Amino acid sequence: MKLDNIIAVRAGKTIYRDGDKAVKVFNSGYSKADILNEALNQARIEETGLNIPKILEVTMFDGKWAIASEFIEGKTLAQLMEENPDKLCEYLELFVDIQMQVHSKKAPLLTKLKDKMNRKISQAEIDATTRYDLHTRLEGMPKHDKVCHGDFNPSNIIITNDGTPYIIDWAHATQGNASADVARTYLLLWLDGKADVAKTYLDLFCKKSDTAKQYFQKWLPIVAASQSVKGNKAERDFLLSWVDVVDYE
């Protein structure tokens, strides 16, 4: 492999283009278990028939772990939204349609979302009483087994030149309640400084899925708490501001 064409830099990893491959190289010290789990997630999602880059190999490059997948030529939905603000509503419609397609799939060997969230809530920097309330609420939520992306945002969708969407970055994929995945996307859009887009997105999703907005709101403090254990201080503070169970009773 000749890795000199950087196409993206993310926390703990750098993505290169090598001909018809996209190679994600993880920083030294990155958890081997997390890397192998990401590759396994991607392989399991391939089997659902969703449009995703096929995984080609897991290897070592210059002493670092790397995952090689098909390179998908195109622009991210985030880029298209930036370049064509007049088409924002059209792109959000597509965004919601793709997410609903993800939720229509099942992958029974994926980690259970509820188990992962319980672990994360236990690690969150919140008081024991609030943690107890959140664990209790999580246990009371309906148990589903839909594929959840876990990081579904416009930068993780590539639109090819012929208009075909591909979904990338399956590191956080789980099976569980789709509304938790929607709450996560809503918070991601807020974190990106796009509160108006987040609200429009949620309205669209509720309309298309015929789901009450109050149901998603019940997930917000749970999802915010579980996500607060990673990210920088500003992100943690923002997410923890949503962790007020009483407000959503």
Summary of predicted features, one role per range:
Residues 62-76:
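Conserved short submotifs of the Hanks-type protein kinase catalytic core
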